[in-house]
UniProtKB/Swiss-Prot annotation:
Homotetramer. Forms an RuvA(8)-RuvB(12)-Holliday junction (HJ) complex. HJ DNA is sandwiched between 2 RuvA tetramers; dsDNA enters through RuvA and exits via RuvB. An RuvB hexamer assembles on each DNA strand where it exits the tetramer. Each RuvB hexamer is contacted by two RuvA subunits (via domain III) on 2 adjacent RuvB subunits; this complex drives branch migration. In the full resolvosome a probable DNA-RuvA(4)-RuvB(12)-RuvC(2) complex forms which resolves the HJ. Keywords: Cytoplasm, DNA damage, DNA recombination, DNA repair, DNA-binding. One of its GO terms (molecular function) is ATP binding. This is Holliday junction branch migration complex subunit RuvA. Its main location: cytoplasm. The RuvA-RuvB-RuvC complex processes Holliday junction (HJ) DNA during genetic recombination and DNA repair, while the RuvA-RuvB complex plays an important role in the rescue of blocked DNA replication forks via replication fork reversal (RFR). RuvA specifically binds to HJ cruciform DNA, conferring on it an open structure. The RuvB hexamer acts as an ATP-dependent pump, pulling dsDNA into and through the RuvAB complex. HJ branch migration allows RuvC to scan DNA until it finds its consensus sequence, where it cleaves and resolves the cruciform DNA. It comes from Sinorhizobium fredii (strain NBRC 101917 / NGR234). Belongs to the RuvA family.
Amino acid sequence: MIGKLKGTIDEIGEDFVVLDVHGVGYVAYCSARTLAKLGSAGEAAVLFIETYVREDQLRLFGFLSALEREWFRLLQTVQGVGSKVALALLTTLTPGELANAIALQDKTSVARAPGVGPKVAVRIVTELKNKAPAFAGEMSASIGLKQELGEGVAAAPVSDAVSALTNLGYSRDQAANAVAAALKNGGEGGDSAKLIRLGLKELAR
């Protein structure tokens, strides 16, 4: 099994990169987000690799971090999510954004990924709710927000508030942290408009 490759970029295609490692060219399929962050041909690159072996083929998938690779594996535990859809999800959402979407049960954000219909989006946020790995840093905002939600806070206004703040240009982690702080400072039980207003105050500090 191949776990990691370090070499020189030989070619970048629409959904793959060819990495030259000591004269051997390895084709690794990547998310568009990963491909965009790689350098140009001739530059050095390191990829974390997930190796798929089938009866008729061997395919490599490349990631810039071990965290992204773990999410690739985790997403495919959901029925209806294969490697293509998993890469589409990782193109549309960062691992941190995925964590927040799952914590908030935000199926709308998940459904933005190509190939992810409403039913699959519901399965992803439902089935991974208790399975998503609690990686340090990437999961902090979602875990904090989940703790602030508790049992008595409606998820819909919270999700709407986070979405509204991201539409204003804030990152999903910033928005989630702001809404979590808003809940803590008197926003619990309020509607999305109140949470947005309090969230903006938190972001302005």
